[in-house]
Amino acid sequence: MTPSVDNNLKQGYQYLFEHLEQSRQRAQPNLVLQEIGSVKSVSAGIAIVHGLPSAGFEELLRFPGDIYGIAFNIDEHDIGVIMLGDYSQLNAGDEVKRTGRVVDIPVGADLIGRVIDPLGRTLDGKGNLTSTQRMAIERPAPEIMTRSPVTEPLQTGLKVLDALIPIGKGQRELIMGDRQTGKTSIAIDAILNQKDKNVLCVYCAIGQKSASVAKILATLKHHNAFEYTVVMVTEGNDPPGLDYIAPYAATSIGEYFMEQGRDVLIVYDDLTQHARSYRELSLLLRRPPGREAFPGDIFYLHSRLLERSTHLNEAHGGGSMTALPIIETEEQNMSAYIPTNLISITDGQIYLSPDLFSLGILPAVDVGKSVSRVGGKAQRSAFRKVSGALKLAYAQFEELETFARFGARLDANSLQTIEHGQRIRSCLKQAESSPLSVAAQIVILLALTNDLFDAIDLAAMDSAQSAAIDGLTSLPLPIIEKLEQAESIEEQDQHIILDMLSQALKPFAQGTLRSGDKIQPTVNEANG
């Protein structure tokens, strides 16, 4: 090799090395430190993940195919994950990555009128949500000093509730009863009655049958309730993890509007299925079982959910969220584990009797076993005046029913109590999806407490009530406005209303039972 060639090679190598050194110095590698775990096993609704030592409790983890799960059991080497999507395609060894965040859901006004799942995915075929604001599904309940007493009524449109078991804004009122006793119907009627009342509604269906959900959606659509309602749905074939997070996600949506100063009504249908899904997940994750195989924190599961419903004071917007949780009892057993838990958490319960339901007394509310612990303070004066003695009279009637089942001949006073009680029961009956206005309810209750229905045959009670409601239009406008506001009824106005009722009910008047007559079979007699 000649010296010139050797020099050229040296210069070339030197240039190359200098260029590489300059490139190395200019290079700024964009390295990202990332933990990657792997799927160890997959079973019904859960996965065991190995690795991810820095993952936090309830952190959202991402699996292949944009499937997500919640880190629920944090062990030394493994993580028990609640799956939130279709896990059937996952295999052992698949990569799992952290997201660094907890489960959240989109919130905002564009959710009104939509049907979504607990992850914010739309189910109604109307396109994706446009809201960019998100809230975590698990949030601490409002502090005591931010709350205000329950003072405003939430009208359900059902006479038996608004008169005898009143509900206030910010209250938690449990709806309980056996299967097929009309629990969901009461909640849906309450939603329908909020039309034009500036109350937003959130309906959360937890693990319900598709046919049942479709029927409810059709009812809401038929009555134009989607104008003020958000519907969240998990169906029976969804992973139990979605059932678990559904009520928390729905509550976050309600909280968003409550913090804007709005009044919200939220329905959980039902928390029995929610508890069962949580039990299934806990057993699969090998958490220690307790009573009825439920885990030890089952009480906290529902208490932290329902404590988020309240009435905020004016300094925090003055909004409210009223909760109507639904649970299913078995064989009328109100003392089972989940029912007693929820009775102790809530501010009262509405108990639906299968015996009343089988006799066609709808809504099948057992007034004796139902109570509203705080709603009475929110009841308007007009309601309180006309319904004050109803509960006592109804209780006396039911006591006499038990005595009358033996076919005993009753004296005149007992017969009068029976007659009046039967008409109370008839007045409290109400067709599904037909909530009544405040004025209509007060007029009927006023006629009832003044014994105007006692001379009317039971078979004509429905027609008589319709006539009484139709007579409202003949009243002076100021009186109608007072009735709609449920203001205190002055004696002069009451005379005018009673005169109208007497004229409206006169065509329906019939003779009453005489002393010594036997009464018709009763609820207790049918049960006997």
Swiss-Prot record:
General function of this protein: Produces ATP from ADP in the presence of a proton gradient across the membrane. The alpha chain is a regulatory subunit.
Cross-referenced Pfam families: ATP-synt_ab, ATP-synt_ab_C, ATP-synt_ab_N
Stored CDD domains: ATP-synt_F1_alpha_C, ATP-synt_F1_alpha_N, F1-ATPase_alpha_CD
Site (Required for activity): S370
Protein name per UniProt: ATP synthase subunit alpha 1
PANTHER family (UniProt xref): ATP SYNTHASE SUBUNIT ALPHA, MITOCHONDRIAL (PTHR48082:SF2)
Compartment(s): Cell inner membrane
HAMAP family with a match to the protein in the record: ATP_synth_alpha_bact
Topology of this chain in the membrane: Peripheral membrane protein
GO molecular function term, any single one: ATP binding
